[in-house]
Amino acid sequence: MAAIFRLIAVALLFLGVTAGMAMTIVPHFLDRIYYTGPASGHFDTERFFNPDGDTDTAAPPTGGSRAGFFWNAMTGRDGRPVWPDAVPIHAAKPAELLQPLPAPPVFTVATPAQAAATPMVATWIGHASVLVQTPGLNILTDPVWADHSGPFGFGPKRVAAPGIAFADLPHVDLILLSHNHYDHLDLSTLKRLWARDRPLIVTSLGNDAILRSRGIPAVAADWDQAVTVAGRPRVGANTYWGRPVRVHVTRNHHWGSRWFADRNRALWSSFVVTLPGGNLFFAGDTGMGDGRWPVEAAALGPIRLALIPIGAFRFVTGQMASGSHIGPPQAVQVFERLRAATAIPIHWGTFRLSYEGYRTPPGLLKAAMACAGRTGFAPVAIGRPTAIAPVGAEAVATTTSDAVMVRCMDTPAVRVLR
């Protein structure tokens, strides 16, 4: 009997999804207008778009119908490798990083040597959520503490608990919010963070409207715009050791939607945070597109730490990337173009959003890094604080070609990674 009820529920959900995807005329009361403004190189006065083309992000992940994709996923007929139901983690309890500073209101300007030695610690919480700590400034990316990635408590269930319990989070000063998909914009988590810490939330155009609907203020900016961060009192107004901290909203290649009628009503983005010891780059969620956006981010200054996605890229056997999500080989190319000193892979091993196996993304990343002859971009454990080394000599600005990467990774060891 339970199986019958499950089949009925799946059928009803399938019909609902099919009806939603089939609608071509959306009544006004069903639409969501998050942003209004003049036309630009990526906004047509109604919806945002990727200036390097949207063909790859608009197509269904498998090249078939969206209804068929959802049906196969819901019924388990998509041939995906089995994931673990739960992954053990050791949650961190990160202490505040304190740098000896003069008592307020007297602040010094750091010398170049002092700035370069500024401590930085990053803790991967899971998926795209990372806590980055420098003295007096705690930064959180796309915070999601929810058990499910989807509306109303539905959607993929997380297999790894957050790497930091919410109660153990230090004071959060700054939140970077890349776009409005449920696995990145979790209103329940954001509401708790706002109530507790009153952080500055920086996002791209339109996403602030979603937050305001829940009483959460946010600062929205367009690509190529910047927001100045005012640190806590021990840091100084608008300065960090006498240097301004700015969040640059930068381009990537993705799309946005909270449900079927609001596609691309809000903008997606990556971010560069200028810090005295080297910049922080957060890629958000992204496909490769024209591949120039990492170079644009690198032009803002040396990148000490890059947070780069490596998962949710495979929807057919052997696929190494999708239009909306880079896979590990492309992630290595992004790392090379950023010329980052260190990178942490994110967007894998937390929510099952595609067809690759649980250990496939880090396995492919290791192989791709070996093919590129690079170091500095390797998986870290959820909940394990990682000290980020200072910026050293800038990496050579070369990128491993697609042809070299494909040829090098055509091995039995890679082919068994489903």
Regions flagged by a language model, labelled:
Residues 132, 142, 179, 186, ...:
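Divalent metal-coordination and catalytic microenvironments
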Residues 143-162, 255-263, 314-325:
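Acidic/histidine-rich helix-loop elements
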Residues 188-193, 214, 292-296, 334:
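A short acidic, amphipathic alpha-helical/loop segment
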Residues 2-168, 203-284, 304-311, 366-384, 389-395:
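Metallo-beta-lactamase
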Residues 154-203, 299-307:
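Active-site metal-binding motif and surrounding structural segment of the metallo-beta-lactamase
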Residues 3-37, 43, 200-202, 206-209, ...:
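Cap/insert and terminal regions of metallo-dependent hydrolase folds
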Residues 194-197, 204, 233-234, 356-372, ...:
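Short, electropositive alpha-helical surface patch
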